A protein has these predicted regions:
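Active-site- and interface-proximal helix/loop "cap" or "latch" segments in soluble metabolic
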Residues: 26-151
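Bacterial Sec-dependent signal peptides at the C-terminal "C-region" and cleavage site
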Residues: 19-26
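Bacterial N-terminal signal peptides that target proteins for export
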Residues: 2-9
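Beta-rich interaction/scaffold domains
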Residues: 149-207
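Bacterial N-terminal signal peptides
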Residues: 10-19
Length: 207
């Protein structure tokens, strides 16, 4: 094989690797619609928002969507008998283009968004749909923080720095930790659990 053909082969491979690395990633987030000024933070409306969050290779949001209408399915399955009013509020959120507020934002940007609280809307809430606005923010954060936390957990330690016995412990903590992170409902719970997992990994003895 000539040097020219080899060079072309390496170039094509490099392009494919780069293209794959830059491929957008779709994450899934969900959060209960909750909160009421008179009833308190634990009041629930009987449904959850279920959204997709598409991010680029830098973790910046390309799009937030619910193209499969999973939120509407959650509303339809409502057990407290408020499906009609909940559907109206969700429709108001969608018509207010709430998803578009997240375009080009990072995790930290989303955390800083001021959607307020039901009964006391913030500047980033969709008018008349504050509970839905808060739930979408929480769902987006759950998706982003879970993805980032799993990546941090997996890459936190280099297995080569540990003896075989400690490597087995390392793998066990990561495997079980990842499974645990995926069960958590809020981004705050995920961040707290990640910190605890890091402490466990820090306690392992290196070579």
């Amino acid at each position: 094989m000539s040097k020219k053909i080899k060079a072309i082969g390496f170039f094509v491979t490099a392009i494919l690797v780069f293209a794959f690395a830059c491929e957008p990633e779709m994450l899934y987030g969900t959060a209960k619609v909750a909160g009421s000024t008179p009833a308190g933070t634990n009041y629930e409306y009987g449904y959850s928002v279920c959204i997709d969050v598409t991010v680029d290779d830098q973790g910046k949001i390309i799009k937030v969507s619910d193209d499969e209408k999973n939120t509407e399915a959650s509303i339809a399955a409502d057990v407290i008998g408020a499906a009609a009013s909940n559907k109206a509020y969700w429709k108001k959120y969608l018509s207010g283009k709430g998803f578009e507020k997240y375009k080009n934002l990072t995790i930290e940007d989303v955390k800083k968004m001021n959607v307020g609280f039901p009964g006391a809307p913030g500047v980033d809430a969709v008018g008349g749909a504050t509970a839905a606005s808060l739930a979408v923010k929480n769902a987006v954060l759950q998706a982003l923080v879970l993805d980032a936390s799993i990546k941090k957990l997996v890459n936190y330690k280099n297995p080569d720095n540990y003896k075989k016995g400690e490597q087995n412990k390392l793998e066990k903590i990561i495997k079980e930790g990842r499974a645990h992170l995926e069960t958590l409902e809020t981004y705050e719970e995920i961040e707290k659990a990640l910190a605890e997992l890091k402490q466990k990994l820090d306690a392992l003895k290196t070579k």
